[in-house]
Every structure is written in structure tokens, then in C-alpha cells.
Amino acid sequence: MSVLASMLAWTLARREHSCALIDADFVAGCLDLLLGVEREPGLRFSQVDAPLGRIEGEAMNHELMTWEGVRVLPYDPWSARQPDWWEVQAAIRALAETNDVVIVDAGQGGLIETVPDLRGGVQVIAAELSVMGLARAKSHRSRLDSWGCEAPHIVGVEPRGAPRGRGHVGIGEAQDYLTATVLGPVKPSVNLCGDVLEGLGIRSVTKGSRKAVSLLADLVEQAIRPVSGASCKDR
């Protein structure tokens, strides 16, 4: 999900949308490592202070590191401090004041239930195209529905390391199982995996991801277009 969120942010920035990327995966985190900007100066989530649940948007935006034109608020999981839900909401609202789009990597998605602005945002599920992956996606979609979220956009991701001809479910089968449109597939990239493992970060929207990410970016633009010029944000 973190790679997909990052590529979506990159694509929207290339389309001249101001974009912020928030790492709200408080179990794994390390979005700055994934992007190869861990040594860059900038605010981390463990340093966010939201007195009375409010943060000044311009000031916060200015303190963030920048990656490919995208403002990034990473989480450092080695810090003992995990942000409270109101701090997450305050960060989202602050960055929504100064960016066209705010993308939140919510990890496994449990945080969505407790943060009102996450429940009210556009939801995206990265579903592994395997029997197990689709079952998990279906379960998560049910959770989103129980929390009052809108129907999510679903992106199918081919499983890594599966034996040739085994363990992989096609887009058509995935759509039948989920009774929903599934974008993709996003194909694994050996070069991207190598770059991330070597600390070089994401250096492009990979060929195997380009079509799905572009279609997802189109959907985000459709979501913000009705109030173009106002302050509607994608979260």
C-alpha cells in the first residue's frame, strides 16, 4: 500500500496538484526509508504537537521534507510515542488547508475507524490478487462499510514470489468475487525492489504500475473537481 500511495502522490504532483503524503501506519511506518529520504531534515509524526487539536497548516507544510514535489510526513516507529487520533486528524486538516490532495497511508486500516476525517475521505484498497488477498480485501471492505465509509476503489496487485501459473487470480475473477471494479493489475518490479532494498527509494512509477496508478489518479481528480478552486481534499 505504501508504494501505491507514493506512486499516486507522485503522479498527482506531476499533474500539477499540490500533494501531501502522510504515513499513518503506526505499526510498520518508515515511509521516508521507502522513498529514500530518511536523511532529509523535516518533521516526523512523533514530533507533531497539536494543542487543542489544531495545527497551523502553512507552518506545518513548510516543516515537511519534500520528495518529487510531494510534501511527506513520515512516521518513525522506533520512537516510543505513537500519535493520538486527534493529532492524526489535526495533521490531516492542517495539510488539507495548504494542499490540493492529502494521501494517507493507513497501513492495515484500523486507524480509519477512530479518525473522522479518514472515514469521510476517498478510500483505496490495495488487494493482492490471490485467494487469501482477496478474502482480506473483502473483509476490509465490510469494515469500511460498517464505519460509514464510501465504497472504496480497489487496486489489484499481483503477488510477489508466486510460482509461475500458480497462486495468481486474474482481474476478472477478482471483480466477480468482490462484485466491484478492480483496477490493475499492478505488477511486481524487480528493479523497484532492488532500489528500495539498497536505500535508493522509489525512483519512478514503474511500467507495471503506470496504467493502474494513472486510472486511480483520474478517480482522485474526479473527486476533487466538483469543487475546483475550493478546499476539497482527498484523504
Q: PLM features: residue spans?
A:
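Glycine-rich phosphate-binding P-loop
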Residues: M1-S6, D23
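Phosphate-binding loop that captures ATP/GTP phosphates
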Residues: L12-R71
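Conserved beta-strand segments of the P-loop GTPase G domain that flank and frequently precede/overlap
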Residues: I22, P74-D76, I103-D105, V124-L129, ...
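Cytosolic-facing regulatory segments adjacent to core modules
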Residues: E56-W67, R71-L111
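Inter-motif core of Ras-like GTPase G domains
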Residues: E97, G110-V131
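Conserved C-terminal guanine-recognition region of P-loop GTPase G domains, centered on the G4
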Residues: A137-E150
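Beta-strand-loop-alpha "switch" segments that mediate conformational coupling across diverse proteins
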Residues: E158-G161, I171-V205
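NTP-binding/hydrolysis catalytic cores, primarily Walker-type P-loop NTPases
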Residues: L197-R235
